[in-house]
A protein has these predicted regions:
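Beta-alpha junction/loop-to-helix N-cap segments that form part of ligand/metal-binding clefts
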Residues: 26, 41-46, 56, 60-129, ...
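Extracellular/periplasmic periplasmic-binding protein-like sensory domains
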Residues: 230-303, 314-320, 363, 369-389
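Extracellular/periplasmic Venus flytrap/periplasmic-binding protein
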Residues: 82, 127-130, 135-236, 271-282
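Solvent-exposed, acidic/polar segments of extracytosolic/periplasmic ligand-binding ectodomains
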Residues: 27, 331-390
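Bacterial N-terminal signal peptides that target proteins for export
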Residues: 1-9
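Sec/Tat signal peptide C-region and signal peptidase I cleavage site
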Residues: 16-23
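Extracytoplasmic "Venus flytrap"
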Residues: 30-51, 71-78, 100-101, 167-175, ...
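Periplasmic-binding protein-like
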Residues: 31, 87, 91-100, 120-122, ...
Length: 390
């Protein structure tokens, strides 16, 4: 566990200011993210996005000085539970923000929400918590997993692709991924493979793809998994033979390592760095200046999580004491999202637009995804109808 002293010195200085007599205590935010191993780049983006938002808001959220406590969940659900309990019981955090991976979300969901603490996920958005297991203490600033994954399925169907090969990790988000794709694609699934979470060698899977000769592949392999798969896919000579469709396999967190190997590959997303909103332009420029890298969805969604908290606390005058009032304030989504339009559905998941994006190389040599076309407008996930909240 470490407190947020780097890389943003400005936040640290602001967060350590002693409050004046009679002022509210510091707002404590616990961030839970994967910050070690091959997927660490995803957690770093999540952490960085939230920190940048706090800096841009003058070191305060809803008028209160902020203390951010960051925990590395190590992509281990049991470790995540131990650390989140420490955030709640020892550190007395007001909010928990995270995690990256859905298996970690499944583990920490009950300990956080049962404690009456608001859990805001800036990435993981599983189908079960969008439906029957929805919870008033759980808010999502990303998406319900199926939605982002459905973009590629819709594109494959509309493009007239006949045969697709599917690959994803064997955990909840992986299963949601393939379900989301198949909900829109009605052609032939020539094969469907679930690999162990964290797998880095794909020689066996690439051999099967070459033998199957599909029109396209659909891949959900985030972080280091995607970095290795894309490089090996290109090296195997398959990139010129079939369409590469994906979700969170080629994005700004992985492109610095994938580089030209990912050029021209497609993904489904709710955002891209070139999304034309004034807020987004400022965010992308600020993130690149602060961290020397192009922000990914993990960063933008956690930036929005900070804006969500700030907007809610402005409505409650900085107070988190009345949980009903706090939840109602969060539900109003009193902020301007980097993606533009944003509102919560009854299950506290966003209703938003989704895009097909394509990997491009910028004039300055950096890589990013760029919007190819809008696929869904004001899209609400299909599981909300099963959520008892209204």
């Amino acid at each position: 566990m470490y407190r947020v002293f780097t890389p943003l010195a400005a936040i640290a200085a602001l967060a350590l200011v002693t409050t004046s007599a009679g002022a509210q205590d510091k707002l404590k935010i616990g961030i839970v993210a994967t910050l070690s191993g091959p997927p660490a780049v995803l957690g770093q983006q999540l952490r960085n996005g939230f920190q940048l938002a706090v800096k841009d808001l003058g070191g305060k959220l809803g008028g209160r000085e902020v203390e951010i406590i960051v925990q590395d969940d190590e992509l281990k659900p049991d470790i995540a539970v131990t650390k989140v309990k420490a955030l709640i019981e020892r550190d007395k955090v007001d909010f928990v923000v995270g995690p990256v991976f859905s298996n970690v979300l499944q583990a920490i969901f009950k300990p956080v929400t049962d404690a009456g603490i608001i859990l805001i996920s800036p990435n993981a958005g599983t189908s079960n918590f969008a439906g029957k297991e929805c919870n008033a203490n759980f808010f999502v600033t990303s998406y319900q997993n199926d939605q982002a994954f459905g973009v590629a399925g819709k594109y494959a169907q509309d493009a007239g692709l006949k045969k697709v090969f599917l690959i994803a990790p064997n955990y909840q988000a992986g299963r949601d991924s393939l379900a989301g794709f198949k909900s829109f694609f009605k052609g032939e699934i020539v094969d469907e493979i679930f690999v162990p979470l964290g797998q880095l060698d794909y020689s066996a899977e690439l051999s099967k793809i070459a033998t199957a000769k599909p029109d396209a592949i659909y891949v959900f392999l985030p972080g280091g998994m995607g970095i290795n798969f894309v490089k090996q896919f290109r090296q195997a000579g398959l990139a010129d033979k079939l369409v590469f469709l994906s979700a969170f396999t080629v994005d700004e967190s992985t492109l610095p390592a994938q580089q030209d190997a990912a050029l021209g590959f497609f993904a489904g997303a709710n955002w891209a760095p070139n999304l034309d909103t004034p807020q987004n332009k400022k965010f992308v420029a600020g993130y690149e200046k602060e961290f020397g890298a192009v922000p990914a969805t993990y960063a933008f969604q956690s930036y929005d999580a900070a804006l969500l908290i700030d907007g809610a606390l402005k409505l409650t005058k900085g107070s988190t004491a009345d949980k009903n009032a706090l939840r109602a304030a969060l539900k109003k989504a009193n902020f301007t999202s980097l993606r533009g339009g944003f509102k919560f559905n009854t299950n506290n998941y966003p209703i938003q637009d989704f895009y097909l994006v394509k990997v491009a190389k910028r004039a300055d040599g950096k890589y990013q995804t760029e919007i190819a076309k809008k696929v869904f407008s004001n899209d609400a996930d299909i599981h909300a109808k099963n959520c008892p909240m209204k």
